[in-house]
Amino acid sequence: APAVSLLYLSSSGDEVVESSVLNNSLLLDDIRIKIDNRAGRVILNSYYATTKKGNIEGLYSYIWDIATKKEMLTNSNRFTDAVRALVTNKRNLKDAFDMFYLDKVSTQSDGSFVVISEAAESYSNRTMFSRWDYFYGGAFYNPYMFYYWNRPFGFYPWARFGWGNPFMFNRWMNPYASFGYPSVTYNANNIALLSFDIKGNLQWVKTIDKKQTDQNVDQFIGYGTLENDKGMSFVYHQKQKGIHQLIVNTLTKDGQLTKSNSIILNEKNYEWMPKSLKQVGEQEAILPYQYKNKIGFAKIQIK
């Protein structure tokens, strides 16, 4: 397996510490880092396989102590069939996590943390994207951005250069979609919430069921989040029987997943961009939208 290291640079620039992430058997993919200032820790998470181009077998966690500048612990949580069944309705549970990509980590006051990921895939008239296309190269890698893993700059696996289509929002004009293919379908589906205790042991798994699809652009699928003292709210757009609405699910601090009243969007010819949502208050957020060939912003309130 390739070498992975965590590098620490002091604020003065005088001290550099390299900590090797020792792992001789797991193939890490889509590595993400979360700094937990409240607990004085750095948390590294990654889905892993045990064979090259194999199925995702579990989630690897590496926790580093900021005060001592040393590794605190590592943990590899192998997914059982019971866990896999919670995130998919497929009969074949082997590949249940193969289309899930890490998005963010929410840390809790007791030292536990919740890993959030979303199922994403793209199809063209010739082929389907595979997470292994860029294994070790990084489907998310953007050499021109330091924080390339932060949304909305580059979450989805098909975003080879940091985002899917930043300058062209019209579905009929996207010559670079899926690397030159004339027609591409983008899917953003279930959101998986995996909770781990302070030692990195898997405690529970919850799923937000959704199915979103679009042609040639990915700006109008996905979800946004708001965090406050009550928990984390997930906001995504859904169209059912001609009615556009924002669906809101909230993960409370005690681990309960609740569904709030939907926000009905009565405006016609508006297309909403929930994954670019920006929180501006405890319960308020700015939500970008496209109206014909114009970009605008709406303020929403999640109660």
Each predicted region: which residue ranges?
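Short, conserved, GDST-rich strand-edge loop motifs in beta-rich repeat architectures
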Residues: 45-58, 118-185
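Beta-propeller blade signature
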Residues: 2-14, 56-71, 133-150, 177-201, ...
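Intrinsic-disorder/low-complexity signal
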Residues: 56, 96, 125-129, 144, ...
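Long, internal scaffold/assembly segments composed of regular secondary structure
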Residues: 2-119, 125-130
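C-terminal structural cap/anchor segments
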Residues: 154-170, 174-177, 195-239, 244
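Short beta-strand elements that form the blades of beta-propeller/WD-repeat-like
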Residues: 1, 40-52, 103, 111-123, ...
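Short, surface-exposed coil-to-beta transition loops
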Residues: 2-3, 28-30, 188-190, 218-221, ...
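Conserved blade-ending motifs and adjacent loop-strand segments that build the rim/top face
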Residues: 19-32, 70-103, 204-224, 253-282
